[in-house]
Amino acid sequence: MSEAYFPVESGALGPEENFLSLDDILMSQEKLPVRVETPMPRLGAFFLERGAGSEPDHPLPQGTKLELPLWLAKGLFDHKRRILSVELPKMYQEGWRTVFSADANVVDLHKMGPHFYGFGSQLLHFDSPENADISQSLLKTFIGRFRRIMDSSQNSYNEDTSALVARLDETERGLFQIGQRSLNDFQSWEKGQASQITASSLVQNYKKRKFTNMED
């Protein structure tokens, strides 16, 4: 089946999201718990409940705790002025990092957050003292789950994989689909339904990047 739109690569695992990517747009809408460190003029009506100082000109007072979408929290965050501080979502805190380090494969990552790796990478934008631990946890979690994901994608031809896929975050689902497509292409070639085996898109993109680096 053809895709409904031309897929755009996510930038969430890098320093900034790619707002031409639907996955990044959805990820940037996920809520992040924050604490207001500097009163914000005329924002009380937007964020406070009715009757709690929500007049049009009422400021958002210092110490207010609320949840903001990631894109807004990043826009308001300032290292020098300290407009707001960010509280780590529970799945990135030390307790869950310990669980991931013990056996990341037992965790339903999609339930924890459909954009677990992308959202976690964007948390590094904020000056948490736990940033180094978060980045290491994300990397080790990905490595710990990668082999099982790819093994499953290569050994489930014409099988129901819905239970497995339901536990994967969106990045992992993309990898699983790549593995499934490669398996299906190989099976088609083996049955004589394809004229030749071609390099995967990952290999082709790697060669392009390598050639570009050589030119530079």
Swiss-Prot record:
Keyword Nucleus: yes
GO CC, one annotated term: nucleus
Gene Ontology annotations of biological process type: cellular senescence; DNA replication; multicellular organism growth
Signal peptide per UniProt: none
Location within or outside the cell: Nucleus; Chromosome
Primary location recorded for the protein, binned into one broad class: nucleus
Keyword Phosphoprotein: no
Segments passing through the bilayer: none
Region (Not essential for folding and stability of GINS complex, but may regulate accessibility to the central complex pore): 1-16
PANTHER family: DNA REPLICATION COMPLEX GINS PROTEIN PSF3
Family listed: Belongs to the GINS3/PSF3 family.
Subunit structure: Component of the GINS complex which is a heterotetramer of GINS1, GINS2, GINS3 and GINS4. Forms a stable subcomplex with GINS2. GINS complex interacts with DNA primase in vitro. Component of the CMG helicase complex, a hexameric ring of related MCM2-7 subunits stabilized by CDC45 and the tetrameric GINS complex.
Primary role: Required for correct functioning of the GINS complex, a complex that plays an essential role in the initiation of DNA replication, and progression of DNA replication forks. GINS complex is a core component of CDC45-MCM-GINS (CMG) helicase, the molecular machine that unwinds template DNA during replication, and around which the replisome is built.
Protein name, UniProt field: DNA replication complex GINS protein PSF3
Organism: Mus musculus (Mouse)
